[in-house]
Amino acid sequence: MGSTASRKKRKYSLERIYDLLMNARQSNWVTLHFTDGDVVSGAIIFNEYKGTGRIINVDQEFSRDFKAAEIRDVKL
């Protein structure tokens, strides 16, 4: 039997995602891993009361709105 390397897909609780996003607000650059498989890097704005935010990459002139429930992982 051969072994295959598979990507580790972490699924944090929504509470943990909120904590990660709250910490990421103070970072200049973060990487968000979305539940749909997208990975986007940039600076974030996050409203913890609404559970929504926006990631902005000025170098690529790109932004994306998101809900906390759409986030799988946050890397600082």
Kindly give the residue locations of the regions a language model identified.
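Conserved RNA-binding domains used in RNP assembly and mRNA/RNA metabolism
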Residues: 2-76
